[in-house]
Amino acid sequence: MNHYTESLAFLVVAAPALLLAALGVASLLDRRWSEPATSRLTRWAIAVALLSALGLVAGMLATGAPRVILDLGNWVEIHPHDAGTDHPGYHFQVKLVFDQLSIPFLLLSLVLCGTIGAFATRYLHREPGFNRFFVLYASFVLGMVLTSVAGTIETLFVGWELVGMSSVFLVAFFQERPAPVRNGLRVWVVYRVSDAALLLAAVLMHRMIGAGDFDKLLGGGAWPDGAASVSESQALLLGLLLLVAAAGKSALVPLSGWLPRAMEGPTPSSAVLYGALSVHLGAFLLLRAGPLLDASPALAVAVVVFGLLTALFGFFTASVQTDIKSALSFASLAQVGIIVAEIGLGWRYIPLVHLIGHACLRTLQFIRAPTLLQDYRHLENAIGGRLPRRPALWVRITPARWRVFLYRLAIERGHLDALLAVLVVQPFVKLFTWLDRLDRRATDTLAGQNRDEPPALDHVPPPSENGTGHHAALGHGHGPNPSHTPNDE
């Protein structure tokens, strides 16, 4: 790789990083940029990154190189204590890979982020949180770029975290209202599950192959070629962790409940986050780990099943929504499920093309969402009457006795939130509440204080709907919080 391609590859990441630094440092120093200056900085940063990526593509086409690798070395190295051991220790390698998977997703991210940035400049004009939005937007762009071109799972994790952090704060953008903050917290919890699975996958990769490099895991060939360098059982275990990470980020069933709640954010963030880019990160991760699916048929079947369940859930739920942003979010979910199923079937280019086309379409639809009623009136005026309304296809072909059941199931969004609360959240809270009391009992005994015996696990009170139950059990509650209201359904 010559100096030309190295410089272009570096600029692709450096431009959004400098944008985040410029906006973030100015905010910390309380010397915020003006709206026109912020808009110009954003446009220039996205333009530099996009032109650098296009120049890199031109260089690759001219030289016939299947990919370009920029290795920035190990930023962290932890050597084993025993010098005679065969274990190589831990190292955090920063490696960027530009290949047939990362470049299309990178170009898609930059084009759509640039479009949304220009739209948000006008949409949020004179909004009190204008500067805060663009700081989070810059963080999101940098996260998407890093995730797109990551050559190691550690680099991908950094970008993954930046996307998740900025997404949560954008959901809770309107902080003066309680609903966006509650829904942002819900998104944060699901993202934490996804992040934990990805972190466990990173640790497992180091235990299996001694590094977090995707080339070592996937055989070193340029995407989509390559073969997994681990056994079938190891591929299944590692792949299941990556599937959980993808499920959390892409809202696959059963972790789909956060997606409509994420619509509390501004329309620009809804378009670029949950309609176009971040909702596809799970599918992108599965595409990157494609050789693992080839090595483990059981893993491929699991991916197909989760994808089809998500597609069906999104299809039925989207058809009963009463607001446009929720309807679009569930429609996006249905397409993401189909993309995931295509990946599980062993296809690589078809889901990539599907992903790009779907992201562009949803971005346009989300941007036009605020003017939907006006567009509808213009269309009716043009045809001189009301538009004909026809029941959905599934309503026409479903027997009458099943319609009410399916309709109610779709209205209740599959009862996924309730099932997760009963089967996962309450048992975990009950267990850790009991462990907390047991720990307090042990520390009080060591300190010479007396405390009642810890209750049996079955008698630990479950968390109440308003969240006061487990806080009181942990010793932090001070009675009900009158300002807290249940989650909106």
Give the ranges of each region predicted by the language model:
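...captures the hydrophobic TM-helix bundle architecture rather than a specific catalytic motif
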Residues: M1-D439, T443-E489
